């Protein structure tokens, strides 16, 4: 049974502007080293980062909590061997997920030159 859904769309330029303005400070606040490294070697680095930002926003919308007591880096977007994205969560994000009865999290990310979008579904049992 579905316990929550979340969706978010991000302008790629918003992320590239933040990286240009704040550099490592922004990257280190929002992304894990894995995420930065993964996106750094992509030809579409900013689209990749924007997709991960959208996924984090969609996740907290799915939980219904927003970022209250959750850090961006508590939500990590990883990719399996086929490139399919999935979430690795920790800290308060993990605790709140468990308290909500969510056992499985599904993630889809799409991006193009101007926008990135992410959709998250939380499922019980």
Swiss-Prot record:
Biological process annotations from GO: fatty acid biosynthetic process
On the tree of life, the source organism's domain of life is: Bacteria
Pfam families listed in its UniProt record: ACPS
GO CC term, one of those recorded: cytoplasm
Q: What is the role of this chain? A: Transfers the 4'-phosphopantetheine moiety from coenzyme A to a Ser of acyl-carrier-protein.
Question: Which family, according to UniProt?
Answer: Belongs to the P-Pant transferase superfamily. AcpS family.
By its UniProt entry, which Gene3D superfamilies does this protein fall under?
4'-phosphopantetheinyl transferase domain
Keyword Metal-binding present in the record's keywords: the answer is yes
What is this protein called in UniProt? Answer: Holo-[acyl-carrier-protein] synthase
Which cofactor does this sequence's record say it needs? Mg(2+)
Report the subcellular localization.
Answer: Cytoplasm
Instruction: Name where it mostly resides.
Output: cytoplasm
Q: Which gene encodes it?
A: acpS
Q: Keyword annotations for this protein?
A: Cytoplasm, Fatty acid biosynthesis, Fatty acid metabolism, Lipid biosynthesis, Lipid metabolism, Magnesium, Metal-binding, Transferase
Name its species: Halothermothrix orenii (strain H 168 / OCM 544 / DSM 9562)
InterPro entries found in the cross-reference section = 4-PPantetheinyl_Trfase_dom (IPR008278), 4-PPantetheinyl_Trfase_dom_sf (IPR037143), ACPS (IPR002582), Ppantetheine-prot_Trfase_dom (IPR004568)
List positions binding Mg(2+). Answer: 8, 57
EC category name: transferase
A GO molecular function assigned to this protein is: magnesium ion binding
Kindly state which reaction or reactions the protein catalyses.
Answer: apo-[ACP] + CoA = holo-[ACP] + adenosine 3',5'-bisphosphate + H(+)
Stated EC number for the protein is: 2.7.8.7
